[in-house]
Amino acid sequence: EYDLTEKMTLFGSFGAGKTQVERLFGYPEIQNSAGDTSDTVSYAKFQTKRWTADAGVRGEFETGFVGHKATFQVSRYSDEFSRGLLNGGATLNSNIYSPVANPMDAVSVPASRPKLSETDLTGVAIADTLSMWDDFLQVTVGARHQRIETDNFNATTGAITSGYDDSVVTPMVGVVVKPNNSLSVYANYLEGLSRGSIAPDTATNAGEAMAPYVAKQIETGVKLDYGNFGATAAIFQITKPSGQLVNNVYNSDAEQRNRGIELGVFGEVMPNVRLLGGVMFLDAELTKTNSATTQGNQAVGAPEMSINLTAEWDTPFAQGLTLSGTVNHVSEQYVNTTNTVDIPDWTTLDLGLRYKTIFAETPVTFRATIQNVTDEDYWAGVNEFSMVSVGAPRTALLSVTADF
């Protein structure tokens, strides 16, 4: 950042990275209610190269009784995805309740990583927050021009097989009313162009980038902030595409509408006792699908309720010692769009302590945490490709930090 004046600042950033992954893996598919699975082992080599940059200017000024905080920004993001994949020949059968130790299937290492897709995102945005009557009313208006260019490539010939070049101007507007210093009431609406999903490895079109889409979000809520304690409440609606596998081909031709309520607390509820967390109630409905068996169903991997609440206590018997506990709860989640299979709800408890002291004139903090104290066995979640992940077992974490 560079301050041109007291009220005008230039800013910019740049970043780049390359990720390479080589792995032998499989995706066991559950065949029936008894938990029987079937799988074919694959060997994959992935590579993702990416870079991003942005620059802009921020400024503050007044027009009459109206204060302005304006921003102009340009941005660019580019990535390239490459993957080599070879499948094994043997089918491995097992059971999630009684695992079978199958002999290792010999799978060759892919000789190359052909490029499968590349994406470029460019954007130009402008926004202004107008403040009136000692910040009693704040109105933010803005617009962003976005362009997404995506090409998919044939893994053998390198030829472009499909592509997208979409651009759109998306709006953003928000209003905040502050009757007093502790209470804020707000509402906002925004749209954004996003890149499409990448087809999963289990699909016949694995690695293919889906078309860009415009997501729309509307939200309204209330925030109470008394300095040492506060609470929030919000309701929201988000519409976006939803992907699905049809005849083993992945497409994002469905639409998902998320409606929800979020309640949160933060701060000191009594001397030396703090709370942080909240609860979310979610109705994630498939509003547009290509099948009557999925129309109106709940989206994959979208729990109707999730809770995360952490409490901390600064102990009176040991100066610098803080004890903490976290409760996590997630309700059942559907595994498929027909809503015939789900994973059950789960609850875990984490316990920890933090001890601050001075060692050799250096502030030092010791931390110890045990996650999933009761060692619950559970399915943690489901991704958009109907892949179920196993919850982490009881885990102990230790760390030491020093402020020099």
Language model feature labels by segment:
Residues 1-15, 19-25, 185-186, 211-268, ...:
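Membrane-embedded beta-barrel scaffold of Gram-negative outer-membrane proteins
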Residues 1-19, 41-154, 178:
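Face-selective signature of the C-terminal outer-membrane beta-barrel domain
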Residues 7-10, 65, 135-139, 181-185, ...:
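Repeated loop/turn-to-beta-strand initiation elements of outer-membrane beta-barrel proteins
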Residues 16-22, 59, 74-80, 143-149, ...:
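Transmembrane beta-strands of outer-membrane beta-barrel pores
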Residues 31-37, 84-114, 160-163, 206-209, ...:
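Surface-exposed loop/turn segments flanking beta-strands in extracellular/periplasmic regions
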Residues 48, 67-71, 75-77, 115-240, ...:
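Structural signature of Gram-negative outer-membrane beta-barrels, strongest in the C-terminal barrel
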Residues 134, 237-239, 252-337, 374, ...:
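Gram-negative outer-membrane beta-barrel transporters
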Residues 272, 317, 328-335, 355-404:
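C-terminal beta-signal and adjacent terminal beta-strands/loops
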